[in-house]
Regions:
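Acidic, surface-exposed loops and disordered segments
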Residues: 1-115
């Protein structure tokens, strides 16, 4: 699944995808973090997921580094990449991570790996 995410198509062919595996005691730490996020933000899915992940042998995390792709496409809401406010993600980064997750999920389905 990590390989599928890593090799998925990317905007401009630039790989800024990050993957990691969480195992062992780190799963409990992640669960504790999700519970703290529930306390801070009040969103119940954090609490649900905090309990659900304790059943897993491992957890695959997929994300992206934030890096403007220099296309000045405007999909982020700004006319140019240089005009983008700090903290506003490049839309291509979001698209890339979505494609990477889709590729990883397709591999999971092929292997009959469920949630």
């Amino acid at each position: 699944m990590m390989t599928a995410a890593r090799t998925a198509p990317k905007g401009k062919g630039i790989d800024i995808i990050e993957t990691a595996i969480v195992t062992g005691e780190e799963i409990q730490q992640l669960s504790d973090t999700l519970k703290a996020m529930f306390e801070e933000f009040g969103m119940k899915f954090f609490l649900r997921d905090a309990d659900n992940i304790l059943q897993a042998e491992c957890i695959l995390l997929i994300g992206t580094r934030e890096q403007a792709q220099g296309l000045n496409c405007g999909h982020c809401g700004y006319a140019t990449c240089s005009g983008r406010s700090e903290g506003v993600p490049c839309a291509l980064n979001s698209i890339d991570v979505g494609i990477a997750i889709g590729s990883a999920c397709a591999t999971a389905a092929d292997l009959r790996v469920d949630t």
